[in-house]
């Protein structure tokens, strides 16, 4: 069910990117990259503030995670809060970028409005959506609750989003896991 929902979101994302056109979608890709960079500067301090606001499920005996080694189990709360902080900072910066994108939409794009340009825009839109979904799923993967872990592990699409996307998987693991808990 999760796999179907994720694929549906990605298909919808392709359609939206196809309708927007290449110029606007390239702008949104740049806004995503810039937002990811700036979120990387603020996420740790934000994550520390969430310890009292957002509860984290304590790991229980015999329960682990499918996506992180067992020796990191008792430090995953740091990754969870850092992920929440990063996602919040990313959302704020990306929202500013989307607001500015309203003006990019005014640029005439008649010359690059062909079918292949629109397909390229759809692919870029899927890439942006994939990054956001990967952040959300990686945050969920840190929660040591059996229902969450089993749901993510049974979903082929979610499992590949968390572990197998070439560039962003390493980026997220580097800033959320390696930088925080080694």
Predicted regions and their residues:
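Alpha-helical transmembrane segments and their juxtamembrane interface "caps"
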Residues: 1-182
């Amino acid at each position: 069910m999760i796999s179907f929902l994720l694929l549906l979101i990605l298909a919808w994302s392709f359609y939206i990117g196809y309708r927007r056109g290449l110029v606007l979608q390239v702008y949104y890709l740049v806004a995503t990259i810039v937002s990811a960079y700036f979120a990387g500067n603020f996420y740790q301090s934000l994550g520390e503030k969430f310890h009292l606001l957002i509860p984290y499920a304590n790991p229980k005996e015999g329960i682990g995670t499918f996506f992180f080694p067992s020796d990191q189990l008792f430090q995953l709360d740091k990754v969870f809060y850092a992920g929440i902080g990063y996602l919040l900072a990313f959302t704020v910066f990306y929202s500013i970028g989307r607001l500015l994108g309203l003006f990019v939409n005014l640029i005439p794009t008649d010359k690059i409005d062909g079918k292949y340009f629109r397909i390229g825009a759809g692919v870029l839109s899927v890439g942006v959506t994939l990054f956001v979904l990967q952040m959300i799923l990686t945050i969920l993967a840190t929660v040591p609750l059996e229902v969450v872990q089993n749901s993510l592990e049974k979903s082929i699409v979610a499992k590949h989003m968390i572990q197998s996307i070439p560039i962003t998987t390493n980026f997220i693991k580097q800033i959320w896991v390696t930088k925080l808990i080694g």
